[in-house]
Amino acid sequence: MSRTVFCCKLKQEAEGLEKQPFPGELGKKVFNEVSKQAWNMWLSHQTMLINEYRLNLIEARAREFLKEEMQKYFFGEGSDKPSGYKEIK
C-alpha cells in the first residue's frame, strides 16, 4: 500500500515518495511533504536547469545551486526558468 502526503507543491493529498530521495534534513522534508507527482515535475525542471545553465554536477557550486533551486521550487517562491528559455513542443 502506498503512503500519502499533503503535497506542498500540489496543495492536495497525493501519493508520497517510496523512500527519502537524498540524505539530510532537506531529504526528510521532501520525503514528508512532497508527492511522487511533484517530485517527477521537479526532476524535469532540474534537467532543464542543468541543460540550460550547462551545469557540471562534479562541481560543488552546481550541486548547491540545484539544492537552492529545489528549496525554492517546493518551499519558497518557486524556481524560475532561465531567461530566454523556450520550451520545445
Swiss-Prot record:
Keywords: Iron. InterPro entries: Fe_traffick_prot_YggX (IPR007457), Fe_traffick_prot_YggX_sf (IPR036766). It comes from the Bacteria. GO terms for biological process: cellular response to oxidative stress. SUPFAM superfamilies: YggX-like (SSF111148). Coiled coil: none annotated. The keyword Iron applies. It holds the Pfam family Iron_traffic. GO terms for cellular component: cytosol. GO terms for molecular function: iron ion binding. The keyword Ribonucleoprotein does not apply. Belongs to the Fe(2+)-trafficking protein family. Could be a mediator in iron transactions between iron acquisition and iron-requiring processes, such as synthesis and/or repair of Fe-S clusters in biosynthetic enzymes. This is Probable Fe(2+)-trafficking protein. It comes from Legionella pneumophila (strain Lens).
